[in-house]
């Protein structure tokens, strides 16, 4: 069972429950050698740091003394680990040696027998440089083994959860097919396999595309494991693309070669021995100087170096979790991807997939938008803004430029004549910023350095396309000046209230429909904060309809506002339909759980304001969705939406 607690980009801070044991994602599974004598780092330390580990059932199966202990005492006793144990099936050995001495059903039976929490099918790992015919043939065999494994588990009543590995080599359409076919089977976790050769060759662009083409066709309610990814420099990008689990033998393998892991690369201990101290504060690096560690006996040096590598690995996972909570995962990704040019290729290629990525990125975040480089232009916040500009119902448009020194929000720093013209400011990062919505996230909540000329020109094509699309409504400067001069001479009673006009446009941008018609615009009133002077509420007959949330200026509905949205928005827009059995809980303002969701607006994005209705479209409650439209229909565990209030009968 998997649920999402927090999110940013496509990264998910979640919880997996397996056999009553919980794993917080994203996380790393240290690779544990099934032979305790060959394990580099003590299991006492592993037990303190890890919620889940991965070991090899094939080595256990083919080593008589290990097999005997595992079959009599269980895998947890064999490796001395109390929490979740995942096992590989021999697929790695198959990829290296071309053959294994075990059948697909034998290894499933064995994994169940030794008490594995999560087993793995014996798939056919297909490297990146094989022919398409070979990749297709291997994939067909993997599908057969997968189907047989699921059938075996069901027929035998096995309790172990199963990994269903996604294959397809470098052929993206085969990765899509693999994800689609495997996704329809009842697997618990979906590893993306055979990417280690790509990572070893620094082919990170291909790694990113393999992940995304797999994710697009996998069920959203199951965790995704990037098999063989153990270097911390790759974690941030991989999490941002939707990977939840990683496994690392790198902490031990690198140590054996004298390699010292960092979050943004690898150093060699022999090259560090003349440094006064390590660039790390873990226990090992605090107790030893580089020279002291380098001069230790080889076995002890390897053990301590592996402990450092493991510490750095978990530290990066913790850093990513915090970034998800704070809403600045993209900034961390951009920082990490500048640690190697090939990794930057991986970041750049994802702009091709922004339509898919945007669907998973929250509409608002705790942190502002920080521009860290040209790649920031392709972030989902900007992509979404450009898409949602078309939600605004324009009558007259004036497009203008402002000085680079003009502070944001523009509307508070420009002498703009209040009128019914939508004034749009050309913006180097966001393309066009309508003054009436420019306090909304992320248009005002951003920090951008001085840009190079080529960066300033990035949005020229977008602005030209917008102007062409709305050519009939765009006023030139002479017409605009004439119009506002004429408008300014109107009687006060004939003028539109600029605050109400502004809120109307903000509602269009946020909800995609005209919420305030002409009749309502004459009745509603705005209320400004006594402290800041900014608009804080929209009221109808002294009753609050909407509150402008301080951190992002989103319009948050009160009860009457929810009723207004329900009236103005056509079904199923901004709705979640729930089962009749939980109607009373919704009316009482209790959270909506995923298993009770029957239908929804498929275009919902994470953290949007939503209306909770029954199958007759009767408004029951209102709140915030944690999941997007697709996830709402696929998740069957955890909270789907938190509620702000309910409507009593």
Curated annotation (Swiss-Prot):
Listed EC numbers: 2.4.2.48
Catalyzed reaction equations: guanosine(15) in tRNA + 7-cyano-7-deazaguanine = 7-cyano-7-carbaguanosine(15) in tRNA + guanine
Stored InterPro entries: ArchSynthase1/Queuine_TRR, ArcTGT_C1_sf, PUA, PUA-like_sf, PUA_sf, TGT-like_sf, TGT_C2, TGT_C2_sf
Listed SUPFAM superfamilies: Pre-PUA domain, PUA domain-like, tRNA-guanine transglycosylase
GO molecular function: pentosyltransferase activity; RNA binding; zinc ion binding
Ligand binding (substrate): 123, 194
Key word Ion transport present: no
Annotated CDD domains: PUA_archaeosine_TGT
Pfam families to which the protein is assigned, alphabetical: PUA, TGT, TGT_C2
Cofactor names: Zn(2+)
Binding-site residues, Zn(2+): 280, 282, 285
Ranges for domain PUA: 573-648
Active site positions, chain numbering: 88
Record carries keyword Transmembrane helix: no
UniProt keyword list: Glycosyltransferase, Metal-binding, Transferase, tRNA processing, Zinc
Cofactor annotation comment: Binds 1 zinc ion per subunit.
Pathway noted in the entry: tRNA modification; archaeosine-tRNA biosynthesis
GO annotation, cellular component aspect: cytoplasm
Domain of life: Archaea
Gene Ontology BP annotations: tRNA wobble guanine modification
EC class name: transferase
Protein purpose: Exchanges the guanine residue with 7-cyano-7-deazaguanine (preQ0) at position 15 in the dihydrouridine loop (D-loop) of archaeal tRNAs.
Protein family per UniProt: Belongs to the archaeosine tRNA-ribosyltransferase family.
UniProt protein name: tRNA-guanine(15) transglycosylase
Record gene name: tgtA
């Amino acid at each position: 069972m998997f649920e999402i607690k927090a999110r940013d980009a496509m990264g998910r801070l979640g919880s997996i429950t397996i056999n009553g044991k919980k794993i917080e994602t994203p996380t790393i599974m240290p690779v544990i050698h099934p032979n305790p004598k060959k394990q580099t780092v003590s299991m006492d330390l592993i037990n303190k740091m890890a919620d889940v580990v991965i070991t090899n059932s094939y080595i256990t199966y083919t080593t008589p003394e290990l097999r005997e202990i595992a079959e009599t005492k269980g895998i947890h006793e064999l490796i001395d680990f109390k929490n979740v144990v995942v096992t590989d099936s021999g697929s790695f050995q198959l990829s290296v040696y071309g053959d294994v001495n075990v059948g697909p059903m034998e290894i499933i039976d064995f994994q169940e027998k030794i008490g594995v929490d999560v087993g793995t099918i014996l798939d056919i790992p297909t490297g990146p440089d094989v022919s398409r015919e070979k990749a297709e043939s291997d994939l067909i065999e993997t599908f057969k083994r997968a189907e047989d494994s699921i059938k075996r588990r069901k027929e035998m009543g096995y309790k172990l959860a199963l990994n269903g590995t996604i294959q397809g080599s470098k052929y993206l359409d085969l990765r899509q097919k693999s994800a689609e076919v495997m996704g329809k089977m009842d697997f618990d976790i979906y590893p993306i396999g055979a990417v280690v050769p790509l990572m070893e060759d620094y082919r990170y662009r291909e790694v990113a595309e393999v992940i995304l083409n797999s994710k697009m066709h996998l069920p959203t309610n199951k965790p995704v494991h990037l098999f063989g990814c153990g270097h911390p420099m790759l974690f941030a990008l991989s999490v941002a693309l939707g990977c939840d689990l990683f496994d690392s033998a790198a902490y031990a393998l690198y140590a054996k070669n004298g390699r010292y892991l960092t979050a943004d690369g690898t150093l060699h201990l022999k090259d560090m021995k003349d440094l006064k101290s390590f660039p790390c504060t873990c226990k090992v690096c605090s107790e030893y100087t580089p020279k002291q560690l380098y001069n230790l006996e080889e076995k002890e040096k390897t053990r301590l170096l592996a402990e450092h590598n493991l510490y750095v690995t978990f530290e990066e996972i913790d850093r990513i979790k915090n970034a998800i909570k704070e809403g600045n995962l993209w900034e961390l990704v951009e920082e990490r991807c500048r640690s190697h040019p090939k990794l930057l290729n991986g970041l750049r290629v994802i702009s091709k997939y922004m339509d898919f990525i945007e669907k998973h990125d929250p509409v608002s975040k705790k942190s502002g938008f920080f521009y860290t480089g040209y790649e920031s232009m392709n972030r989902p916040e900007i992509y979404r803004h450009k898409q949602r500009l078309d939600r605004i119902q324009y009558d007259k448009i004036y497009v203008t430029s402002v000085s680079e020194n003009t502070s944001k929000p523009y509307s508070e720093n420009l002498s703009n004549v209040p009128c019914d013209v939508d004034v749009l400011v050309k913006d180097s990062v966001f393309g066009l910023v309508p003054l009436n919505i420019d306090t909304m996230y992320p248009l005002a909540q951003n920090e951008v350095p001085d840009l190079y000329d080529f960066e300033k020109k990035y949005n020229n094509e977008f602005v030209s396309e917008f102007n062409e699309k709305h050519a009939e409504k765009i006023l030139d400067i002479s017409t605009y000046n004439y119009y506002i001069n004429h408008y300014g001479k109107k009687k006060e009673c004939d003028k539109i209230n600029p605050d109400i006009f502004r809120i109307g446009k903000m509602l269009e941008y946020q909800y995609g429909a005209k919420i305030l018609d002409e009749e309502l615009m004459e009745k509603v009133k705005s209320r400004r904060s006594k402290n800041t002077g900014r608009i804080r509420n929209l009221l109808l007959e002294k009753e609050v309809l909407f509150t402008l949330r301080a951190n992002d200026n989103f319009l948050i509905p009160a009860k009457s506002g929810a009723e207004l949205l329900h009236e103005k928005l056509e079904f199923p827009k901004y709705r979640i339909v729930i089962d009749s059995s939980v109607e009373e809980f919704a009316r009482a303002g209790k959270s909506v759980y995923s298993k009770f969701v029957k239908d929804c607006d498929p275009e919902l994005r994470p953290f949007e304001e939503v209306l909770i209705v029954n199958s007759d479209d009767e408004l029951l409650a209102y709140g915030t969705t944690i999941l997007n439209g697709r996830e709402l229909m696929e998740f069957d565990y955890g909270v789907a939406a938190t509620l702000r209030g309910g409507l009593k009968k």
